[in-house]
Amino acid sequence: VVLGSYVVTRVSQYVKEYGSRFMVVMDPVLKDVGLADKILQPLNERNVDYFIFDELNDGANSKQIQQALELAKQGYVQGIIAVGGTKALNIASAVAALFNESFGIYDCLDGTVPTKEALPLICVPTTIRIPFLFNPVIPLIDARCNQIKLMKVQKEICKLAVMDSTLIASLTENQKSSISLETLCIAVEAYLSQKASFFSDMFCEKSAELFGYALDGSKSLEI
């Protein structure tokens, strides 16, 4: 995991360790908020060969995953770069998990578990809502019945996560409000948990206090 401000400018340096040709699974909303070029420019500067898959309008469903998987195989990619929120990251995870398998997405949704080595997956989250980033199970929509199913993937499928705080700061106001509310709920849930400790309570209380400052429109989070 790489954390920090403007670390996305070095993403091309990181991905070079995993190959030279990639498929970039990107949330189309990033173009609207001016983040797409910010992420792709470092790849262009270091001549990283890539193509973009951004047809994510219907969520992480099996049809889009099947389409992305076919494009990845036809493009002989050596890795997947996922940019965006949970939707983009889940689709990219499914493609990486299935790339070297002889069966498809619907076999996995019906219970078949991938066993071959997954394609290297590099994630660049643009939100803090990434609960399945390092989880061997991801939720997907089965287009046959329009129901959410859990797909098992290989452990440690995400080889690298580049988390840049400036990407989150560029979100729309509605996205920021949604993320803030969910994060506040997580803090409250953790505080009330039976597994809570003195230290976890301290972090939860401090996070709730900081959110209070932020939601009140404070220019500074200094307490």
Regions found by a protein language model. Give the residues of each.
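ATP/NTP phosphate-donor binding region
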Residues: 1-79
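Short Gly/Thr/Asp-enriched flexible loops that form oxyanion-binding sites at enzyme active sites
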Residues: 39, 69, 88-102, 134-135
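N-terminal loops that bind phosphate or other acidic moieties
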Residues: 44-45, 74, 95, 112, ...
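Buried hydrophobic packing segments
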Residues: 68, 91-96, 187-188, 208-214
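Glycine/serine-rich anion-binding loops at beta->alpha junctions
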Residues: 77-93, 126-128
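A glycine/threonine-rich phosphate-anchoring loop and its flanking beta-alpha core
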Residues: 100-198
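Active-site segments that bind and position negatively charged phosphate/pyrophosphate groups
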Residues: 190-223
